Amino acid sequence: MYVVVNYTRRLQTLAFNLGSSCYHQGVTGASITSQDRKSKQNFSCCRWTHLITLVHQYSTRISNSKVPRVATWEPVLENQLPPPCQIPVDLVDKLERLALVDFRNQEGLACLEKAIRFADQLHVVDTDGVDPMDSVLEERALYLREDAVAEGDCAEELLQLSKNTVEEYFVAPPGNIPLPKREERAAMLKHSEF
C-alpha cells in the first residue's frame, strides 16, 4: 500500500509540474480538443493527468476485503449462548487469591457473572478453518544479545534487600488483600445487601 501511495504522489507531482505547462498552452486535464491533439506534449500531459486520476482511484481503495471499513456489531440472541453458570465458592476463593480482587459481596459476584456471560458470546464466533495462535512471535526468530556480566558479583547484595528469601530465591509476599476463611466468607455473603 505504501509503495502504491508513494508512486501516486510522484505521479501527482509530475502531473502538477507538467500541468502548468499544459495550462499555459490552453490545455486542461479535463478535456482535449482536436487542435490540441496535434501537439504531442499537450496530449502526453493530459494522458499523465488521466493516468494519475486512475492510479489515485485504485490506490485509495482498501485492497483487503476481509477487513471491514467500519466496525460491525451483531447482537447475539440469548438462545445462542450456552446456559449461564453458577460460580462455586471454591472457584471464587481461588480467583480472589490469584487476582487479588475482592468479591466479598453479592454485587461483586453479580458483576463477575455478568462478565462471564458477556464473554460467552465468543462461543458463537465461527472459527472453522482458523488455526489457534500459539504465540504472537511464532513466525519470528528472536535474536538475543549475549548474556555478559556488566558488574561484579552482586547477588548477595540484592538478596539482602529482600525481607523473605529461601536459599538463593526471592519470596513473593502474599496478596495485599487479607482474605477471609471460607466460613467467614459464606457468612458475609448471606448477610450482604445487594
Curated annotation (Swiss-Prot):
Its EC number is 6.3.5.-. This protein may be expected to contain an N-terminal transit peptide but none has been predicted. Allows the formation of correctly charged Gln-tRNA(Gln) through the transamidation of misacylated Glu-tRNA(Gln) in the mitochondria. The reaction takes place in the presence of glutamine and ATP through an activated gamma-phospho-Glu-tRNA(Gln). Pfam families: GatC. One of its GO terms (cellular component) is mitochondrion. It is found in: Mitochondrion. GO terms for molecular function: ATP binding; glutaminyl-tRNA synthase (glutamine-hydrolyzing) activity. Keywords: ATP-binding, Ligase, Mitochondrion, Nucleotide-binding, Protein biosynthesis. This is Glutamyl-tRNA(Gln) amidotransferase subunit C, mitochondrial. Belongs to the GatC family. Subunit of the heterotrimeric GatCAB amidotransferase (AdT) complex, composed of A (qrsl1), B (gatb) and C (gatc) subunits. NCBIfam families: gatC. One of its GO terms (biological process) is glutaminyl-tRNAGln biosynthesis via transamidation. It catalyses: L-glutamyl-tRNA(Gln) + L-glutamine + ATP + H2O = L-glutaminyl-tRNA(Gln) + L-glutamate + ADP + phosphate + H(+). The keyword Nucleotide-binding applies. The lineage of its organism: Eukaryota, Metazoa, Chordata, Craniata, Vertebrata. Its main location: mitochondrion.
